[in-house]
Amino acid sequence: LVDYSEKVISLVKKRKDLHPDDPAIQTIWNEMVDILKENEQSAISFLNQCGEEDLYWLSEIFEDLSSEFQSRAFLDCLLQLQKKYPDLDMEQDIEYAIQSMED
């Protein structure tokens, strides 16, 4: 899990340094999704260990992860993170996770 976490966190750092309009952002998002979607349980454990700032940046890919996982477990993870960090505005991500389970 350490390599995995380090990879994702280093991508988050890269993402933080980019200008909001930088086209490279999409590539970073795709890489993060590719790593996290491999194993839902690992992804959930990883997200639960993240701090608020990293989660803020990772929340940009929550919709993509929701459509990959389409699961109650991932939705529950988002709900717990929202409770833990009420300042993170995750309502849309949670809505999307619910919708993706219904599709």
Regions found by a protein language model. Give the residues of each.
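Short terminal alpha-helical segments
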Residues: 1-33
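Solenoid-like repeat scaffolds
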Residues: 15-18, 48-54, 68, 83-88
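Structural detector for internal amphipathic alpha-helices that build alpha-solenoid repeat scaffolds
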Residues: 26-36, 59-69, 91-103
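Amphipathic alpha-helical scaffolding segments comprising HEAT/armadillo-like alpha-solenoid repeats
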Residues: 1-11, 37-49, 71-82
